[in-house]
From Swiss-Prot:
Quaternary state and interactors: F-type ATPases have 2 components, CF(1) - the catalytic core - and CF(0) - the membrane proton channel. CF(1) has five subunits: alpha(3), beta(3), gamma(1), delta(1), epsilon(1). CF(0) has three main subunits: a(1), b(2) and c(9-12). The alpha and beta chains form an alternating ring which encloses part of the gamma chain. CF(1) is attached to CF(0) by a central stalk formed by the gamma and epsilon chains, while a peripheral stalk is formed by the delta and b chains.
Function statement: Produces ATP from ADP in the presence of a proton gradient across the membrane. The catalytic sites are hosted primarily by the beta subunits.
Keyword Transport attached: yes
Subcellular location: Cell membrane
Binding residues annotated for ATP, in chain numbering: 155-162
MF-aspect GO terms: ATP binding; ATP hydrolysis activity; proton-transporting ATP synthase activity, rotational mechanism
Keyword Cell membrane recorded: yes
Record protein name field: ATP synthase subunit beta
Gene responsible for this protein: atpD
Catalytic function, reaction form: ATP + H2O + 4 H(+)(in) = ADP + phosphate + 5 H(+)(out)
InterPro entries: AAA+_ATPase, ATP-synt_VA_C, ATP_synth_F1_bsu, ATPase_a/bsu_AS, ATPase_alpha/beta_chains, ATPase_F1/V1/A1_a/bsu_N, ATPase_F1/V1/A1_a/bsu_N_sf, ATPase_F1/V1/A1_a/bsu_nucl-bd
Protein keywords: ATP synthesis, ATP-binding, Cell membrane, CF(1), Hydrogen ion transport, Ion transport, Membrane, Nucleotide-binding, Translocase, Transport
Phylogenetic classification of the source organism: Bacteria, Bacillati, Bacillota, Bacilli, Lactobacillales
Amino acid sequence: MSSGKIAQVIGPVVDVLFAAGEKLPEINNALVVYKNDERKTKIVLEVALELGDGMVRTIAMESTDGLTRGMEVLDTGRPISVPVGKETLGRVFNVLGDTIDLEAPFTEDAERQPIHKKAPTFDELSTSSEILETGIKVIDLLAPYLKGGKVGLFGGAGVGKTVLIQELIHNIAQEHGGISVFTGVGERTREGNDLYWEMKESGVIEKTAMVFGQMNEPPGARMRVALTGLTIAEYFRDVEGQDVLLFIDNIFRFTQAGSEVSALLGRMPSAVGYQPTLATEMGQLQERITSTKKGSVTSIQAIYVPADDYTDPAPATAFAHLDSTTNLERKLVQLGIYPAVDPLASSSRALAPEIVGEEHYAVAAEVKRVLQRYHELQDIIAILGMDELSDEEKTLVARARRIQFFLSQNXNVAEQFTGQPGSYVPVAETVRGFKEILDGKYDHLPEDAFRGVGSIEDVIAKAEKMGF
């Protein structure tokens, strides 16, 4: 183990000088320094640059308060390594793989893997385009997720991103026995805390590993925490052969942390002040999220769009990697339609006849056409009323409203708030239900019977209760 001494500390950046004859640490190696406090607190630094003459520049993963020039720094000889395997389920970690819940810490001999790895090679990748059934009608019908694909989840505050994420974790765990890894990147600590307790109450936590790099942490930790979560997910994929769900909230904050680190390292900023290495950093993360012949990692990434500008380099760079987009819309929340997924703005590469089948594709296309036409007619209805529409248009509007309500459903994880049991609807049931609505089979049933239900059988049962 070679050792050096701290030469200077500039916020989260620490320069370390290694004496002549000492082996210089490699880029991305973890260095360790112990503070002079009572607990001898360990601070981990990651090597970012070699400046020459035995000097390396590092980024701290924790606060550098208390570090002084001349302190001894040890090279661990390897990158940051985090615990992996079944023991991580139900636990909460930070970027270094240390547990931050109140339960017993991991033992020193627990299996660990480095957070820096190469993406799978071409011959390791799986070429099949298989749909990941979520049991959520609006997603499965109109913007299906691919196994091993990447989904962008766009939405403002209070439109149901967290509930949708929890429902996806619940459904994958219940129906597929799948594992989920939740990674909070630059999360508000309060939100992360709420999510942890909600997941504990709903029982989903047993199939989930959680990793947090909160908003108050140094940029190095926020930048690397996504890799920590991904490393845990990769182990389940490659060693256990599992289909894993990886949630990253928020991918924009990963970019933001990278921008801060880049400025601290003295790199010249690029467009809009972002780091010149933006596309490379995003690519290194995204290319590791994929399906191999052993298993898959499907990622659902919340993406904040600064000032609603989709041409901003941060969301624009993320877009290039996405297979599906799920857009949450505030207008649907106001109508009481949950999940508030916008059926016209959401899209998926998987919605193609060769992947989902001819019938599914045709039904989805017709649902979109009917909703689009209803959208166009809304101005006429608002100004002149329904009476000005032709009989054909009146029928279309009635069916569109039934479709809009049928796209909603009660979530299992929200049962404690709504008092209504949640539902999981297989894709075949979803397609059949919408096909029958489009064919006019249920034109005689009241609109309210379609709201917040699962399959079409639930609609019929609800209508009977209402006296129809």
